[in-house]
């Protein structure tokens, strides 16, 4: 299932505190993504992070609610696409009518059932998502970065009239929301995958370990080689202690922007003394020092920020899904390049066709990304024709 109001840190603080820690108690954790133009992608990223850390393989989304009868198949695909990219593999459609009787049936979108004239063709949409979901369930995620989730920093800013309903009024909270969205979009545009780390999870499931001769920070089932601290004004002392241990054993910590000014809601400069790389937020990606395994550039050689990616490793194979999250902008002749070499197969979730797209010591090819286009690839060491 899902909880009420997830779209922002303010909404979570107002209604439930922190959405991520609730997922521990759900067999199939989920979200509710309302409207056609909801671009709060981070709510699904929070769910994906918790699911990875908790070892939960199924992620639910109640989707398509509060859209409209103009909602066509392209819209069904586009709204579902980015959610599938970030792990949604159980689609709970809003909605299907039992009957058309009653005033309560004035709902949106049109019934995804026999009452709609287009319903006999809806399998085209669902077959597409079935293939995409199975594709994204293979292997394990390629994700080395943990981003501390700053929701508890907002808890310290609650006072009369700090917000109006679910909209922040407090200027510091508004800035925290802006930085939160900016961090998400900056990392995704840079083709750098990450998980959020809830401080309650870090306290109860966090540890510092050595893996293959390298220091890692573990949260439950997931391990991370780098930790990013940004957009936080408060940090738990337990989090600070684990980060100190991680740094002392050779772990990599990056603090982008101002470090937390409070520890357990008490003014402190301890976070500013962490052994870490300190940088301005605009230099965050460079300071991370993570070499992306894939890039997608336009004709001028600029990285196309609208194309997001998820990478997974399945034995010797590298699995990649690239997705143009822009519904209006096409990117023709984009240069796609991977650091990996071998044989690059395209798996088409629309038609189920598989064909060889490129090969070489370093996979590189041109591709036309239509608005809302997806590209599913498998890079193998051997030609599997």
Which residues make up each language-model segment?
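Carbohydrate-binding surfaces of carbohydrate-active enzymes
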Residues: 1-385
């Amino acid at each position: 299932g899902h909880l009420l109001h997830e779209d922002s840190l303010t909404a979570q603080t107002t209604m439930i505190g922190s959405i991520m820690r609730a997922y521990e108690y759900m067999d199939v954790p989920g979200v509710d993504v309302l409207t056609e133009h909801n671009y709060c992608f981070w709510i699904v990223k929070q769910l994906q992070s918790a699911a990875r850390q908790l070892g939960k393989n199924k992620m639910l989304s109640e989707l398509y609610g509060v859209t409209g009868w103009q909602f066509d198949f392209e819209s069904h695909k586009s709204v579902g696409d980015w959610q599938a990219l970030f792990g949604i593999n159980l689609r709970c459609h809003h909605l299907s009518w039992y009957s058309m009787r009653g005033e309560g049936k004035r709902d949106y979108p049109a019934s995804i059932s026999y009452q709609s004239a287009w319903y006999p063709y809806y399998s085209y949409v669902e077959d597409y998502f079935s293939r995409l979901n199975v594709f994204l369930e293979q292997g394990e995620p390629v994700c080395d970065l943990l981003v501390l989730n700053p929701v508890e920093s907002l808890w310290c800013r609650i006072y009369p009239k700090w917000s109006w309903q679910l909209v922040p009024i407090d200027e510091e909270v508004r800035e925290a929301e802006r930085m939160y969205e900016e961090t998400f979009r900056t990392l995704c545009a840079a083709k750098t995958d990450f998980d959020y780390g809830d401080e309650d999870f870090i306290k109860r499931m966090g540890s510092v370990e050595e893996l293959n001769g390298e220091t890692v920070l573990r949260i439950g089932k997931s391990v991370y080689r780098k930790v990013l601290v940004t957009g936080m004004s408060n940090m738990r002392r337990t989090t600070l202690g684990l980060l100190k241990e991680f740094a002392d054993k050779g772990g990599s910590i990056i603090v982008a922007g101002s470090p937390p000014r409070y520890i357990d809601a008490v003014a402190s400069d301890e976070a500013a003394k962490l052994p870490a790389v300190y940088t301005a937020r605009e230099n965050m990606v460079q300071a991370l020092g993570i070499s992306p395994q894939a890039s997608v550039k336009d004709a001028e050689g600029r990285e196309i920020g609208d194309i997001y990616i998820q990478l997974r490793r399945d034995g010797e194979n590298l699995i990649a899904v690239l997705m143009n999250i822009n519904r209006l902008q096409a990117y023709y002749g984009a240069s796609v390049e991977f650091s990996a070499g071998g044989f690059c197969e395209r798996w088409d979730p629309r038609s189920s066709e598989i064909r060889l797209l490129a090969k070489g010591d370093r996979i590189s090819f041109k591709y036309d990304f239509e608005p809302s286009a997806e590209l599913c690839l498998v890079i193998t060491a051997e030609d599997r024709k």
